[in-house]
Amino acid sequence: MAERGLEPSPAAVAALPPEVRAQLAELELELSEGDITQKGYEKKRSKLLSPYSPQTQETDSAVQKELRNQTPAPSAAQTSAPSKYHRTRSGGARDERYRSDIHTEAVQAALAKHKEQKMALPMPTKRRSTFVQSPADACTPPDTSSASEDEGSLRRQAALSAALQQSLQNAESWINRSIQGSSTSSSASSTLSHGEVKGTSGSLADVFANTRIENFSAPPDVTTTTSSSSSSSSIRPANIDLPPSGIVKGMHKGSNRSSLMDTADGVPVSSRVSTKIQQLLNTLKRPKRPPLKEFFVDDSEEIVEVPQPDPNQPKPEGRQMTPVKGEPLGVICNWPPALESALQRWGTTQAKCSCLTALDMTGKPVYTLTYGKLWSRSLKLAYTLLNKLGTKNEPVLKPGDRVALVYPNNDPVMFMVAFYGCLLAEVIPVPIEVPLTRKDAGGQQIGFLLGSCGIALALTSEVCLKGLPKTQNGEIVQFKGWPRLKWVVTDSKYLSKPPKDWQPHISPAGTEPAYIEYKTSKEGSVMGVTVSRLAMLSHCQALSQACNYSEGETIVNVLDFKKDAGLWHGMFANVMNKMHTISVPYSVMKTCPLSWVQRVHAHKAKVALVKCRDLHWAMMAHRDQRDVSLSSLRMLIVTDGANPWSVSSCDAFLSLFQSHGLKPEAICPCATSAEAMTVAIRRPGVPGAPLPGRAILSMNGLSYGVIRVNTEDKNSALTVQDVGHVMPGGMMCIVKPDGPPQLCKTDEIGEICVSSRTGGMMYFGLAGVTKNTFEVIPVNSAGSPVGDVPFIRSGLLGFVGPGSLVFVVGKMDGLLMVSGRRHNADDIVATGLAVESIKTVYRGRIAVFSVSVFYDERIVVVAEQRPDASEEDSFQWMSRVLQAIDSIHQVGVYCLALVPANTLPKTPLGGIHISQTKQLFLEGSLHPCNILMCPHTCVTNLPKPRQKQPGVGPASVMVGNLVAGKRIAQAAGRDLGQIEENDLVRKHQFLAEILQWRAQATPDHVLFMLLNAKGTTVCTASCLQLHKRAERIASVLGDKGHLNAGDNVVLLYPPGIELIAAFYGCLYAGCIPVTVRPPHAQNLTATLPTVRMIVDVSKAACILTSQTLMRLLRSREAAAAVDVKTWPTIIDTDDLPRKRLPQLYKPPTPEMLAYLDFSVSTTGMLTGVKMSHSAVNALCRAIKLQCELYSSRQIAICLDPYCGLGFALWCLCSVYSGHQSVLIPPMELENNLFLWLSTVNQYKIRDTFCSYSVMELCTKGLGNQVEVLKTRGINLSCVRTCVVVAEERPRVALQQSFSKLFKDIGLSPRAVSTTFGSRVNVAICLQGTSGPDPTTVYVDLKSLRHDRVRLVERGAPQSLLLSESGKILPGVKVVIVNPETKGPVGDSHLGEIWVNSPHTASGYYTIYDSETLQADHFNTRLSFGDAAQTLWARTGYLGFVRRTELTAATGERHDALYVVGALDETLELRGLRYHPIDIETSVSRIHRSIAECAVFTWTNLLVVVVELCGSEQEALDLVPLVTNVVLEEHYLIVGVVVVVDPGVIPINSRGEKQRMHLRDSFLADQLDPIYVAYNM
């Protein structure tokens, strides 16, 4: 790899003055810590070296020449453009709020462009669907994901010249080169922080990579489709697919990246260099860990790829706007001083005049409230509220208190009386919706409002009270989140008549609160907008002037009379002007959509208050009634004129009803908001005057917040109508929607702000939010305030056009800010509905919102699917919607979900409760029936795939390393030679001899006890019994089996003592035992082939088993799974003849083979290793010393006895050490969960061993049974060590849950620990009885993906808790090695764990002669730095060693070994290394219904399989949650999400997931998934 031009040699570095060397070293350190950039480093470094550069160049010309020979191969990351969606679709019905024929044409035109191209996307597969396709053949997704760069292209290859190879032959050159190949680091952060440093040794590794690794047979390739042929960086050879039954040997690939050589006091390098090291170490200080706060800095700048702004994006060019004033508010002499005064006036002088008419369900008038009745009943209510609810001394209500008004939408009369009654009593009404159920959508937030307003009293009608949900004993239910309320019925018969002398107190309107109107924010929180009496009055005056209201006019109100324009016009302005309101409830509109038009016709109404929805419904029902006239209407107030899509409804209504007398100038759109009240309204026009113009705006311009008349593609235009002028007496300005309230330019979209006496005054009880909304002082571009008049934010987006006309283009609440561009949710809904949806979705039942995922907002569209829509129709419609939104808005949709009809949460008036829908989506409770995720097209800010950076030069790396004061990462258990032992066992070299000796010395000493599910002893074995049983088995092997010494014998037994006897029987006969898990009788097809495979691979001459299993092996069911005719000799050992061998076999040397240990790894590889007699002896001795085992001890074992340490503990250790083993077969726990713990308690066991499966079973199964355990008298205080036997990274969370759960029954939190072993050495670590407790560290996951270790503090984001895997066993040494260069790395650096120990296996057992592989794995040497030339075995696991402050048993500082994960399990994605367990842990956390999760890769796509333990309707809820969490926490896009039934993910006896088996089943379409989602 080409390095920097001026690369001084070690000699040149040594020649530099000490202070320059020190500064250089500091600089290297800063670079490795990430404190400075590569560029800054280069600059400072060249400045430092410039005075010495001539010498440097002369001394190192050889290096220069060498560098010129090493030109790196170009590495182009091939990313194909994200695929657009191509498939023709047909579509359906629309919601007329969003209807626009122009827009529909635009959408159809946009879709037409896609017509020719086919969609390159597989349909999701759903169980019980007629459209299930095989994932393997029909569903190969396009290889176009941003996460699927071709991995070969991300790797660099270094060419090496022949001359260089020659020069590397002598040792001196090795040392110098390897020192140059080292790299900088600190104690807490490891070397590769700026990419990989590859010195010449690394290059050499490249050259020999093929001979070392690639030629050997390997497991089926799982992650790559291409592989760089000459680079060791390709972990797995490509395109080698072995048949499932193929014989596979253990093999650990060279890892792709790891930190490189770090030298210090651990391994001698060269004395000449070490003096220099000593000098530097003495002069330079050790680096410190970064301060705590640094771990919590949001590092999105480093992570996120910020999309470059489009150079052609439109920018505002106008001048800064000036606030626009409305006409002055006219002063009319007879206007009342307060609204209550107007009521008093009309109620006493015009008592017979009609005030309000209510309709029945058929739309006929049912009751008319006169002004006299309104006045008298309001008066009675006011008097009752103040005087009759409590005692005289303790009234329940005082003026200024808040009360809730709970009246249905079809009872305007009762509501009006209650509202004015409150005003007269000077209590503050808070109108809310009638709760329908205990848990209404958004009901909890209404409860929050009631609580924050301090409301204890609710007014309602008798009818409404009867309809409220009740408990069984007739009380009103306690609504979720609500305070306790007292309900008061306001029907006349319950009210007291005030005495003659009682009069309400009506003062002139001031700033005291009059009423509170609730408002739901975008997030779903409900706030109370407080309106003062003065604002209420002023607003009525402004409306009266703007609408030119006069006494006696009739107004038809179709809106909700409890809030917004329905309240202001229909309840306030009518009283102010003595008008007559006819209230048409929503329920009547549903049954008789034309009722409001009929009311206008019948009453010759002058004004109608409607929404676009009402216009649309009237048009739909128009044919039912032809003889209506709307000629009396002077104003048709369209109150949702602020919706940009209202223009088409208005146009359509006018064209239909103009023939019925509707005047074009009568249509008056207006814009309102809860905070600013009426923002603008179009005044009633003069007949014959030209109608206001339209604005045809570019959607692209709008997305950048700029007003541009649309000239480009007419498909992406938005036509908006004005909403008239500013209100009388008001002033309006437009400010930027985000940041400080800076005035916009004239061609810029912003938030409309209004200043007048007619707006709200505050959010009740929320001072902080109030200031930002109700007290806004606009500033100019320099940031200085413009005037001192406070404005109110209206929450509407728009601009002031020519002639001071106000245009609204959307709401702040509907704003979706995606990748720096603004989109309006309503616009997206309109586009979705313009895609003809025929039978797919319901109009008006679409929700659009954004969710924040990976540092940006992502658009989610949710719609209700019609029950009769087919899967195919739905999928077609969804695909077309994606195309349409992409074409028209140039934005991708992250997720499109269809839910069953009527399942979206509704608002009280029947709309969709958006925030609640979003909440359900995020918590996984939406239950979609169809879903499409498109993360590949939307997520454009992923970090660039990692590419190897040019490394820091070898010499400077060397210096930097010395600065860090690093020691080599190595650790060792106690030295076996120093341990004094006077044990008689030591004189025996073979385990069989020890058993014979014990049978003579202590014949009756019980070694084994086997328990059943009830906890009773079913079998015991004393030394003599075991010896005799073994003799008889040995005899049978000779007689029946005709076996010779050295023949392999498969032992097929359930966990028990028979298995142990058979093992020693084989040793006595000189045969080689191979323990195999028996097949599962109920699942032969899955379990028998593994047995067959081990029998074949081990070339077994005979199978020892029980009668039951023998019958099973030869059964018809077995014949369906394997060839039963070719089994070797099968001997059942149930009834043995009483015969013994004349002479027991004694192996000639301890190096002879004792037994074979076969195991299937998590990657699906079957590996057999050879264990010699000396290794067996050494293993047992190490365990005996570590656990202090001797004859009087008793241990309990609850794990599988077929391989690894589990086998050794079950079968070997008791015979060696003489302790008693209580054997608990794990499968018995399924029948009795208490078995293991009750056994430990019963026998007062101090040391117990189990597997993760057992621990998980107890944690999950006994989680809520701790009290039962206590009552049974189970106490675990006797337990000193509870050891989990594992070959993986410790599962800290499970261990902690177990400890926490059972601490209540005495389990010491210090007791639980784990072991660590691998195929090459089954027992490397085991906690044991002495030495410090296992330590834990938090490491940074991001660094781990780069093969670095960075220690962080607890709670740091992206941190991973790692626990030490027990203590290293006596006689065991480990070193951490860079798997590529085979050079040792420094303390706290990540690398492969290599082990040296007398009990290491002697090699793989294989039918091929792979001597080289054996050498590479079992007898390999460090490439440099080890004068002793120790032989090491490669474990295939990544980990690191860290020296702690604790003291080991030897008295020295303790070195902790941390296991990170198996190399061959890791996934290489986007140039980074991922451990599947980390992704799985994230996924398992997201939803309560996920039982288990496993991940693997398929054609460069990440596949996530989740087991669903809930109901099947939750299956699709998991798809977005899985996609979100993997994106957020791991920066990866999930390609396929597969939802399966519990138990589908195969797990082996050690509790490890068999991901490769799962992958094979997935590709063979054998999973029977509930749902398969292919993310686009």
From Swiss-Prot:
Family from the record: Belongs to the DIP2 family.
Keywords, alphabetical: Cell projection, Neurogenesis, Phosphoprotein
Protein name: Disco-interacting protein 2 homolog B
Subcellular location per the Swiss-Prot or TrEMBL entry: Cell projection, Dendrite; Cell projection, Axon; Perikaryon
Phosphoserine, modified sites: 9, 50, 53, 100, 146, 148, 153, 178, 193, 203, 259
GO molecular function: alpha-tubulin binding
Domain DMAP1-binding: 12-131
Alphabetical list of Pfam families matching this protein: AMP-binding, AMP-dom_DIP2-like, DMAP_binding
Subunit structure, interactors included: Interacts with alpha-tubulin.
Task performed by this protein: Negatively regulates axonal outgrowth and is essential for normal synaptic transmission. Not required for regulation of axon polarity. Promotes acetylation of alpha-tubulin.
Modified residues (Phosphothreonine): 71, 140
Leader sequence residues: none
Biased composition (Polar residues): 52-62
UniProt cross-references to InterPro entries, sorted A to Z: AMP-bd_C, AMP-bd_C_sf, AMP-dep_synth/lig_dom, ANL_N_sf, Dip2-like_dom, DMAP1-bd
Composition bias type Basic and acidic residues, residue spans: 92-104
GO annotation, cellular component aspect: axon; cytoplasm; dendrite; extracellular exosome; membrane; nucleus; perikaryon
Tissue specificity field: Moderately expressed in adult brain, placenta, skeletal muscle, heart, kidney, pancreas, lung, spleen and colon. Expression was weaker in adult liver, kidney, spleen, and ovary, and in fetal brain and liver. In the brain, it is expressed in the cerebral cortex; the frontal, parietal, occipital and temporal lobes; the paracentral gyrus; the pons; the corpus callosum and the hippocampus. Highest expression levels in the brain were found in the cerebral cortex and the frontal and parietal lobes.
GO biological process, any: positive regulation of peptidyl-lysine acetylation
Keyword Phosphoprotein in record: yes
